[in-house]
Amino acid sequence: MKEPWQEEIFFEVWVMVLLIFCYFCTSVNSNPKIENLPNRYISKTTIIMRTDLSSQIKLDRIPRRYYNPDNEIELTALRREEKLFTRIFETISDGGDFIASEMARYINRYTEQKGRCVLALGAGISTHRAYASLIKLYNEGRVDFSNVIIYIIDEFFPLLPDGPSVLKRLREILLDHINIKPENVRTINPEITKETMYEYCQAYEQAIADDGGIDLAVFEIGPHGTVAFNEAGSPESSYCRLVLLGNEIRHIISKNYNCDEVPTTAITLGVANLRSAKRILTMAWGENSAEIVRKVVEGDANPSVPASLLQGHPHVKLVIDLGAAEDLTRISQPWKVTSCEWNDKLIRRAIVWLCNMTGKPILKLTDKDYNDWGLGELLALYGSAYNVNIKVFNELQHTITGWPGGKPNADDTYRPERANPYPKRVVVFSPHPDDDVISMGGTLKRLVDQHHDVHVAYETSGNIAVGDEDMIRYFLMMDKIAPMFGFNNDGYNKLSTEVQEFIKTKSAGDMDNSDIREIKTMIRQAEATIACNYIGVKPGNIHFLRLPFYETGTIKKGDLSQRDVDIIIKLLQDVKPQQIFVAGDLADPHGTHKVCTDAVLAALYELRDEEWMKDCRIWMYRGAWAEWEIDHIEMAVPISPEELRFKRNSILKHQSQMENAPFLGDDDRLFWQRAEDRNRATAQLYEGLGLASYEAIEAFVEYKPIK
């Protein structure tokens, strides 16, 4: 006799097999076609699509004087913790313009002084904005490249026919648009061999010396503080050499260069070569760079963070935007280096920090604690520690709710979500077919149990994240049961043979054909359907949007287009939700979460004048790659031990995304482990501050649509 859990597993596998089989029998395509959408759903051409609204999300207002003070005295005080000269700009665009103007200034200066200027250039994705601005300056006649010599700071080896090339990329983004002489572009000779590598690298260094050395080096700070292809462990004395590329950087290269095959080795100038430049301009953008920027700027010089070895160079400038600067002391903890412009969020952050420093809960903090740790300004503003403590404690207390859709017939004055209307129409947008349960599985279950009309919209197919073994498993099972149920016809047998033969002969980096991508899509859809059924979401409320930008079959995705946005507009117009949940994981290393969020926000922008939008609240969740900082949390949904186990089970319904999932990132934990650890950590943080003790908490931040 089977145990209950065995029956459940059998049922799940059977449902998955039937869904996949039925798909190929009926040739049903669940991807909405834009040409078939009613006219009322298609955006008018007079509306300009806003495709990057997520970059305008400002969780906090940073006073300008923290990053761009009026005088050098204040700047010196702000930079007290910084060991590398850093310029912070509000936007990436502003930072790129500054780098371009600096490059033009130095090129003009050196060509005037000695007749030429020697540049060492990288072509990392962060440099593109600066080079675009530099081209604009060239077109305006403000810089001349006729006497400029350019050395490429790194190149792949060997150069594959269809593989990535730094020189090719640099031509696309800069060299083909300026008056640089072809003979003045120095790069790696593709005909060299490993046997002649050492001599060639020495000759490359000698050529730089013969040209008078590097006047200006321009490059990005990469993951974990890499510079050029100098990864963790590269010493300050490292020179031009052949290096082995790690798996993570190869994955990033594959994505940035839109290629599946990346060499395992490359030639790079060493840290010593880059430090020999008379001047250095380096850059990093976005909040996913914030942690490494803090290590580079405020940490000790350490070969484990190669960019930190630039400390001590007399003429180095690191240029970053506010996103990349958010972990620097002058931005995240300004009370340590200057007088503050206090607001509710900064006060909350300061008090949470003070609790961590003293080991006390909020309500036990004293005037002495505030004075001892440099927060005396708050005592002057509020009169006593007691007043500040009560203010922050109440704010945090009011974020906690067991009713994420609002508690009916209750006073909602101090609740994060309004009581009425009840029940609400709710749409949960999930970038991949598992992000909903990973990031807000407990909240999703609460919404269903509290009788809201919950819709789950899976924005992408997630098909490239299904391993070949997971797909073959279902074919092997269908091959066995096909004769039992009479669907072992010629069509099915031909498809099964072709698919299994393709997988056997598939090489690393080969793109799946369209049939296999559809099968993998069905696997993800079946898993999501089973998870939704487990939670209690109605079958008719499960939507597979399959946004076109994702369907390239490769890691590199297409650009967000109006077709993507119109699919979301149709769903929103059909449901007319009163509550929306959207991914806020803007630091997702694979980029899909950000694009999906941009698609939703673009749709909401186009629908901003709809009557139902006046009665709709939008909440952002995290959990797959990061968690909200407590000073930003506006709704905290507690999860009991039983609910946390239920959430784990709902995540485990996505079996293809367990141990052998292709894109787990650089975190060794499985997705359910990450989710539980983050949810428990949030609950422990609340408990440590003196609030109620919960097993876990899921956190949310409200998004205010741009009008």
Region spans (language model):
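Glycine-rich anion-binding loop/nest that anchors nucleotide
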Residues: V218-E220, N256-V297, K317-D321, F581-G584
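N-terminal glycine-/serine-/threonine-rich phosphate-binding loop
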Residues: I47-V118, D412-T413, N420
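ATP/nucleoside-binding phosphotransfer catalytic cores, i.e., glycine-rich phosphate-binding loops
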Residues: R50-D60, I73, K278-G374
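Class I SAM-dependent methyltransferase SAM-binding "motif I" and its flanking Rossmann-like core
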Residues: H224-V271
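Cysteine-centered motifs
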Residues: C22-C25
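Ligand-binding beta-strand-loop-alpha-helix segment within the catalytic cores
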Residues: P69-K83, V143-L216
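A conserved mid-domain beta-alpha-beta active-site/ligand-binding segment of alpha/beta enzyme cores
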Residues: W628-N679
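Active-site beta-strand->loop->alpha-helix modules in alpha/beta enzyme cores, enriched
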Residues: T193-K194, M357-P433, V437-K614, R648-K653, ...
